[in-house]
Amino acid sequence: DLADIFNEMLDRMRSYTELQEQFVEDVSHELRTPVAVIEGHLSMLNRWGKDDPEILAESLEASMQEIKRMKTLVQEMLDLSRAEQVNIHYSNERTNAKEVVHQIVNNFRMIYPEFVFTLDDDLYSEKILKIYRNHFEQILIIVMDNAVKYSTDRKEVHISISTNLKELEIAIQDFGEGIPPEDVSRIFHRFYRVDKARARTKGGNGLGLSIASKLIDSYKGRIFAESSLGKGTIFRIFIPIQNTDEKE
């Protein structure tokens, strides 16, 4: 009857509004780190870099890279907002593993000077990953941002990269709050937060790890967490590598 039709219409409108709100939250979450990188470089230039050509050139180049990444990121977030299942159109894209990992770690060292970021690079040569560079950067930023956010007194993050015959493994370890055992399997669910009150104080909204997980799944990779409550968490990310006998 008319009442049922009206209620159905309201449900559709409510669903659409929720999707729009999710999109705004997604974009806000994902743009925060690149904005911080640009702000850090501009602040450095404002203090002493204007008269140093080397610092000026380096900061401008890094800022331009982040602006370009932000523009691409907005389009990719539009894709994420349109469907729960990410459709990847970059199956032929390849990315240099060492280069990107070192770049992201250096960016975090600049943004969070109070933290110690230790990088153990066990790769003897560059490895080519079967993933779009912007997506790989996005995944690393999400997980490292999470490590920083939930660190406590011990402000350290350990990052290691190694490889087997088929995959690159990135391990990102913090020494913070940790995750209760019953929550570890659910942290990759969209909007899931271990402690909503605590997440609000830290700016968390339960989006980042869900996005990272979807992107990794789309490239036939894996991500999982090992955690000890009160001692910290290790995230392990596995991304397929291109073997030397494979065609570009």
Model-derived regions, located:
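Membrane-proximal HAMP signal-relay module
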Residues: 1-24, 41-50, 61, 82, ...
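A conserved beta-strand-to-alpha-helix junction within the catalytic ATP-binding
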Residues: 91-109, 116
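Conserved catalytic submotifs in the C-terminal HATPase_c
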Residues: 91-94, 114-127, 131, 165
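Short helix N-cap motif at coil->helix boundaries in the Bergerat
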Residues: 97, 178-189
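Short helix-loop "hinge" at the ATP-lid/N-box region of the Bergerat-fold HATPase_c
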Residues: 147-148
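Short beta-strand/loop element within the Bergerat-fold HATPase_c
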Residues: 154-166
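Acidic ATP/Mg2+-coordinating residue in the GHKL
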Residues: 174
